[in-house]
Regions:
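Conserved catalytic core of two-component sensor histidine kinases
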Residues: 58
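Bacterial N-terminal signal peptides
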Residues: 9-20
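Extracellular/periplasmic head regions of type IV pilus-like filament subunits
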Residues: 25-52, 63-69, 73-127, 132-137, ...
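Bacterial N-terminal signal peptides that target proteins for export
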Residues: 1-11
């Protein structure tokens, strides 16, 4: 082999090895961005939710509260079950299911009052518990199940 062919082979081999080294993934923790909680984008001006899961839970509560107001106006008493609310306002048959994704809904109704709670499957700063009754105010708590004494969600 001539000297120029040998030099050319060495250069090509060097370039191939360099490309192969740079194409490999870095080991875990090297050059990787730190894992952070995704930033929540509010759904509307004044949105009190801290995550998409909270936004869905609060939206569900607002639908139930509006349906109860409409039901009470029409029948002069509150619905005693979620099934009674079907077709009141925008409350649908599928909404009777208490499994609401990251939350579980609990409804206790009487003709003169009701209590609705949304309990997260894992409570943390982005998954607070929520509570509402017939006054329509939604209360929230990030450390324990929310109740009437918990702060009102703004």
């Amino acid at each position: 082999m001539t000297r120029s062919k040998t030099s050319g082979s060495i250069v090509v081999t060097f370039l191939l090895l360099t490309c192969a080294l740079f194409a490999q993934d870095p080991p875990p923790g090297v050059g990787a961005a730190p894992q952070t909680t995704p930033i929540y984008t509010p759904k509307f001006h004044g949105d009190p939710a801290r995550s998409d899961s909270e936004a869905a839970a609060l939206a569900y509560m607002r639908v139930v509260i509006r349906a109860q107001r409409q039901f009470n106006k029409q029948y002069n008493h509150f619905a005693t079950s979620l099934a009674e609310l079907v077709h009141s306002g925008s409350f649908t048959k599928r909404m009777v299911n208490s499994d609401r994704g990251d939350y579980t809904a609990n409804f206790k109704g009487k003709k003169d009052s009701y209590v609705l709670t949304m309990t997260p499957k894992n409570m943390d700063a982005q998954h607070r518990s929520f509570y509402a009754e017939d006054d329509g105010k939604i209360h929230g708590d990030e450390t324990k199940p929310a109740d009437a004494n918990s702060p009102v969600v703004k």
